[in-house]
Amino acid sequence: MAKLKITLKKSLIGRKKDHIATVNALGLKKIGKVVEHEDNPQIKGMIKKVSYLLEVEEV
């Protein structure tokens, strides 16, 4: 499977609690932090929910 490189680009201040929880579940806490995850339906769904906060690249 492909890997996805996910970067947090915007602040979590003032966001809905479920959006903050989703970003934290992806392993992102600070702006500019980068994580890699396998490309699977669960991760795709999490990315879709908070896509306005993230930058996603295929590795």
Curated annotation (Swiss-Prot):
GO-annotated biological processes: translation
One Pfam family in the UniProt entry: Ribosomal_L30
UniProt keyword list: Ribonucleoprotein, Ribosomal protein
InterPro entries: Ribo_uL30_ferredoxin-like_sf, Ribosomal_uL30_bac-type, Ribosomal_uL30_ferredoxin-like
Gene Ontology MF term list: structural constituent of ribosome
Subunit and partners: Part of the 50S ribosomal subunit.
Name of this protein: Large ribosomal subunit protein uL30
Organism annotation: Clostridium kluyveri (strain ATCC 8527 / DSM 555 / NBRC 12016 / NCIMB 10680 / K1)
